[in-house]
């Protein structure tokens, strides 16, 4: 971290992207500034954002590969230049972009002689390859080569114990870290009692998301992390009664919900489609898969109903709360969407 004296202003706190470039398909760079900050605040924000960017951003990668008739990962396969271990390492480097949650299957099935690249991976519809030219293996003979793959979205660095699996599958140490590196520097500006700080933040990503998208997601994760402290504890409610209870994401929700209940204007809920609610594509797809097409369908579901939907997560509940709170001018019933 570097501190230097530079000229600056004392305007309202704001951020801006001052540089953005694509060095390669798997290397994006972005440089951002946040200013003006009081003395010490730049360090606080810089440290928190750096840790969130490196450890809290989710990524998608290949976590397991299954070969046929391979005794161990150090084996060689006739007609293939690389060993099984080298193929696993190449698969580990494949960069994927997706909004999937949970585990999905993929595969490779080709006939040699030819080079196998990431483009040869048969993926589920929700997953795409960032760099299709990434190498996997070189088939030197006319053989049929097939691999079954497992894909998962997670965060951080996941390792599994090495052991021989009877079905011929091998774990791949997953690196679910779309952000490759983060640097920040602090510059002081002003004179005397009017000194302020400017935070410069540099972000490098692997191409599965842009630095701006990574910064947004890291900021949202930090907000969600601190959000529980904004909720006042209800009087007369013990910790044991409250420990398993979900708290809506905005501390002003109860107040706004009261205002919504005062609105007696009748609205045909079956004519308001969830397409109009500005939901994220992931939340929207989850609801669509559960045959929830209108606001009436949504309000007819309980928390338990929604949580039984495949791939539906707590973040989706929060997002639905935010959206309804912002756009819903109707009288919500206590037993409707009670989460």
Curated annotation (Swiss-Prot):
One of its GO terms (cellular component) is DNA-directed RNA polymerase complex. It is found in: Plastid, Chloroplast. Residues 1-233 are annotated as: Alpha N-terminal domain (alpha-NTD). The keyword Phosphoprotein does not apply. Disulfide bonds: none annotated. The keyword Transcription applies. GO terms for molecular function: DNA binding; DNA-directed RNA polymerase activity; protein dimerization activity. Its EC number is 2.7.7.6. Keywords: Chloroplast, DNA-directed RNA polymerase, Nucleotidyltransferase, Plastid, Transcription, Transferase. Residues 264-339 are annotated as: Alpha C-terminal domain (alpha-CTD). It catalyses: RNA(n) + a ribonucleoside 5'-triphosphate = RNA(n+1) + diphosphate. Gene3D superfamilies: 5' to 3' exonuclease, C-terminal subdomain (1.10.150.20), DNA-directed RNA polymerase, insert domain (2.170.120.12), RNA polymerase, RBP11-like subunit (3.30.1360.10). GO terms for biological process: DNA-templated transcription. The N-terminal domain is essential for RNAP assembly and basal transcription, whereas the C-terminal domain is involved in interaction with transcriptional regulators and with upstream promoter elements. In plastids the minimal PEP RNA polymerase catalytic core is composed of four subunits: alpha, beta, beta', and beta''. When a (nuclear-encoded) sigma factor is associated with the core the holoenzyme is formed, which can initiate transcription. HAMAP family: RNApol_bact_RpoA. Belongs to the RNA polymerase alpha chain family. NCBIfam families: rpoA (TIGR02027). DNA-dependent RNA polymerase catalyzes the transcription of DNA into RNA using the four ribonucleoside triphosphates as substrates. This is DNA-directed RNA polymerase subunit alpha. It comes from Psathyrostachys rupestris (Hordeum rupestre).
């Amino acid at each position: 971290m570097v501190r230097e004296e530079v000229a600056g202003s004392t305007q309202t706190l704001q951020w801006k992207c001052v540089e953005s470039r694509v060095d390669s398909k798997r290397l994006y760079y972005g440089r951002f500034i946040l200013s003006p900050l009081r003395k010490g605040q730049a360090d606080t924000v810089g440290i928190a954002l750096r840790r969130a960017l490196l450890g809290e951003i989710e990524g998608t990668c290949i976590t397991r590969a299954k070969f046929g008739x391979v005794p161990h990962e150090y084996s060689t396969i006739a007609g293939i230049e690389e060993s099984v271990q080298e193929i696993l390492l190449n698969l580990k480097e494949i960069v994927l972009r997706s909004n999937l949650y949970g585990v999905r299957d993929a595969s490779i099935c080709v006939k040699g002689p030819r080079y196998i690249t990431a483009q040869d991976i048969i993926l589920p519809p929700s997953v795409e390859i960032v760099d299709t030219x990434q190498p996997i293996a070189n088939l030197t003979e006319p053989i049929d080569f097939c691999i079954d793959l497992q894909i998962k979205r997670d965060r951080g660095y996941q390792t599994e114990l090495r052991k021989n699996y009877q079905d011929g599958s091998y774990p791949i140490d997953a690196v679910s870290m779309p952000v490759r590196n983060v640097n920040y520097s602090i510059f002081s500006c002003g004179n005397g009692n009017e000194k302020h700080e400017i935070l410069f933040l540099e972000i490098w990503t692997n191409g599965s998301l842009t630095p701006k998208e990574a910064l947004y997601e890291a900021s949202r994760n930090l907000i969600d992390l601190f959000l529980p402290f904004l909720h006042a504890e209800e009087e007369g409610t013990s910790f044991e009664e409250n420990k398993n209870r979900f708290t809506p994401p905005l501390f002003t929700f109860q107040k706004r919900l009261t205002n919504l209940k005062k609105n007696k204007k009748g609205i045909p809920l079956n004519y308001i489609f969830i397409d109009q609610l500005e939901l994220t594509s992931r939340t929207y797809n989850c609801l669509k898969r559960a045959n929830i097409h209108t606001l009436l369908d949504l309000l007819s579901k309980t928390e338990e109903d929604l949580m039984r939907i495949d791939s539906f997560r707590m973040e989706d509940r929060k997002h639905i709360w935010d959206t309804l709170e912002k756009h819903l001018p109707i009288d919500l019933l206590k037993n409707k969407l009670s989460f």
